[in-house]
Amino acid sequence: HDQYRDFYKAAPSFDENYACRLPDGSIPEHQRWAGGPQSYLCATQAPYYVKRNFTEIKKHGIRLDGAYLDVFTCNEGDECDNPEHRMTRRECYEFRGRCFEYLLSQGILPSSEEVSDWAVPSLVFCHYAPYDFMMKKPGTPKEGVPVPLYNLVYHDCVIQPWMMDKVSEAEDYMLYALLNGGAPYLIRDAAYPNIDGAFDDNVTLSRKEEIERSKAVTELHKQVAKCEMLHHEMVNGDYMVQETTFSDGTGVRVDFRKQTYQIFHK
């Protein structure tokens, strides 16, 4: 875990001149997270700090195979009007992408919080890519019918771990992991209680049950991780029964009403 956006005033390297500045000259600040008061580091500076930190880690004989640059893919692009390093939102994405590209150049697999189309060329995996309703307290009414739009385009491009919570006897997130051909989360703890889709009132499963469920999702992911998702449908027009088809011929049908699934080969 590492990140190059939240710019904490307590950091030895903090310099207000490198923070994102608005056109009126003000600098957005808050103290929502555990690091205390902060602003936002202008992304024009992020590649420098990424290279500095990972070079120092390497000097200590630590050989990393993967790194998680937090928040880059879950937050909108920043703008900066500091005349020394002005930046548009598009340029912000480009500078964030350079950070991922640097990791790749060092043989380090880059990851970030969610998935975004601008990051696809240089992102190998992510923290998660949940449907919108999964971020809300279980039982909150869904806004429409969730469908795998992102994976219909980018399934074979990014490894996506999925929530595996059984939130009630009528809702099991494992079914969405299977439908999307994703990787499973065996254990997923949020940084803070009841945030990022991590709630405490789910159905309690034994560790053995969690492992068995994860094995089922893992076996499917081994088959289809590098395959395109070619097709998604609501079977016979029933949105509670959905089916996806992958480019190797693997099909997955889930019945959200019965809480069941089938994996087959076409």
Task: Name every feature range the model reports, one short phrase each.
Residues 2-3, 116:
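Short beta-alpha junction loops
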Residues 3-18:
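Active-site cradle of extracellular carbohydrate-active enzymes
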Residues 12, 38-39:
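Flexible, active-site-adjacent loop/turn segments at secondary-structure boundaries
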Residues 14-28:
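Flexible glycine/proline-rich, aromatic-decorated loop/lid segments
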Residues 22-25, 34, 40-266:
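Active-site-proximal substrate-binding groove within the catalytic cores of carbohydrate-active enzymes
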